[in-house]
Design a protein with these regions (language model features):
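Beta-strand segments within the central parallel beta-sheet cores of soluble alpha/beta enzyme folds
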Residues: 24-29, 53-59, 103-110, 128-133, ...
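Glycine- and Gly-Pro-enriched alpha-helical subdomains that act as flexible
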Residues: 185-233
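N-terminal extracellular/periplasmic Venus flytrap/periplasmic-binding protein-like
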Residues: 103-190, 253, 258-260
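Single conserved hydrophobic/aromatic residue that forms the stacking wall/gate
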Residues: 1-16, 20
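Active-site-proximal alpha-helical scaffold in enzymes
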Residues: 29-58, 94-124, 179-186, 273-286
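Conserved catalytic cysteine-centered active-site region
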Residues: 14-50, 81-86, 146-172, 253-285
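Short, well-ordered amphipathic alpha-helical segments that serve as non-catalytic structural scaffolds
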Residues: 14-17, 37, 86-93, 109-114, ...
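Flexible glycine-/small-residue-enriched beta->alpha junction loops
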Residues: 46-97
Length: 286
């Protein structure tokens, strides 16, 4: 199927002429899709099935199909809140830990400030490729902006009229893409390449779907246990900021050190294009 991005992108690029012989597939784990692609490639390398692979993700959030006004819900599942929206799950987490609107707004403001500082200091320069679009050169993410606290506080709740989450404390609608090469270490050194990081452990975990954003807690615990590490052993953490409330829930419930988390800002400032985000946060962590 030529329109699948993993197949069509290499064909469109200046890749080797025999690129069509390489296997390609689509991975779907929503927000974690391209991170799951990293996991699958590393597993393939560990098993000896592959030497290297490209993990990439792309998303245009303006084209996400689930946002229409006529969704076809299965009535039995709907009664069980299976189709609860992501914003509603974040509201649940905010209520569970009594995370105030003020705390969420402060978190969002800090995300923008850190991202702006990182842009000013050139922290993203080595991870962003300049592209041309409509005769305009794009050299940096457009999301980070100087926060206007007065305007932020004037916003209405976005998902629950009595809730605490607003557009300002949610990740914005955005477009993005990210990619990386995962390779067998011996082969990389043979080719005189300079690996940026080593995958020591990986894990996924399921949670109550009405508390979707709590997933990083059990997944991180599993990954740390497999690696023989504690959260205190980790110097830097990239935590996807789907919502400020969700991020604060994970940080507080897990007892994570805020000084180590998203030091260059997160998705509330940079954006959260679903397919892109998993690999984007790994690239930023490097």
């Amino acid at each position: 199927m030529i329109r699948r991005p993993p197949r069509s992108t290499p064909l469109y690029s200046s890749a080797a002429s025999d690129v069509y012989k390489r296997q390609a597939k689509v991975v779907n784990r929503f927000c974690g899709s391209s991170m799951d692609a990293v996991h699958q490639i590393s597993q393939s390398i560990n098993s000896g099935d592959s030497i290297a692979g490209i993990a990439a993700g792309v998303e245009d959030m303006f084209q996400v199909p689930m946002g229409g006004f006529n969704p076809s819900f299965h009535p039995d599942l709907y009664e069980k809140e299976y189709y609860i929206g992501m914003g509603e799950t974040a509201e649940n987490l905010a209520k569970d830990l009594d995370i105030s609107r003020n705390d969420q707004e402060e978190f969002s403001v800090n995300s923008h400030k850190k991202a702006l500082k990182a842009q000013e200091d050139g922290k993203f320069n080595n991870e962003i490729l300049e592209i041309e679009f409509n005769e305009e050169k794009l050299t940096k993410d457009e999301g980070p902006r100087e926060p206007n606290l007065e305007k932020i506080k004037s916003l209405n709740p976005a998902f629950d009229e009595n809730g605490t989450i607003t557009a300002a404390t949610s990740s914005p609608i955005s477009i993005g893409a990210a990619a990386m090469i995962i390779m067998d270490e011996t082969k990389a050194l043979e080719m005189n390449l300079n690996p940026k990081f080593r995958i020591k452990s990986r894990a996924v975990a399921g949670v109550d779907w009405t508390r979707m954003g709590s997933g990083p807690l059990p997944a991180t615990e599993k990954a740390l246990n497999k690696a023989g590490l504690n959260i205190s052993d980790i110097d830097l953490i990239e935590l996807n900021e789907a919502f400020a409330a969700q991020s604060l829930y994970v940080i507080r419930k897990g007892g994570w050190d805020t000084d180590k988390i998203n030091v260059n800002g997160g998705a509330i400032a940079l954006g959260h294009p679903l397919g892109c985000s998993g690999s984007r946060i790994i690239v930023t962590l490097m």
